[in-house]
A protein has these predicted regions:
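Bacterial N-terminal signal peptides that target proteins for export
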Residues: 1-7
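Long, charged/polar, soluble alpha-helical segments
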Residues: 2, 13, 17-111
Length: 111
């Protein structure tokens, strides 16, 4: 009986961590899309704000993600960092392109 309890507790823990990854992934995607929108509008400060929020969530998702989605999340995190760096230099076009790349990776991680 004890073994069954431990197995069920372990299964619940495994299932709950993937739910947390999905929540962070959804938030990262939302903020990355906002960053792209602000980039198209030409607003580097707002773009940087959303890119930083997306990066925070993508890093949190990466901690609990596994396998191929984790690779996409890590690539998205790298692109988001590039977007932040470029927007801090007021290079909106390059920052927008990096944010768009991050969105592509985040969407691929959901599949």
């Amino acid at each position: 009986m004890k073994k069954i309890s431990y197995v069920l507790a372990g299964l619940l823990l495994c299932l709950s961590t993937s739910v947390f990854a999905e929540d962070h992934l959804a938030e990262a995607t939302k903020h990355a899309n906002e960053a792209v929108s602000e980039g198209h509008a030409g607003s580097a400060p707002k773009m940087m704000h959303h890119a930083k929020a997306a990066l925070d969530h993508s890093l949190a998702a990466s901690i609990v993600a596994k396998s191929i989605p984790k690779n996409h999340i890590n690539a998205a995190s790298k692109s988001l960092q590039e977007s932040i760096d470029q927007s801090s230099l007021n290079q909106v076009a390059g920052a927008t392109k990096s944010a768009e790349t991050a969105v592509e990776h985040l969407n691929a991680a959901k599949k």
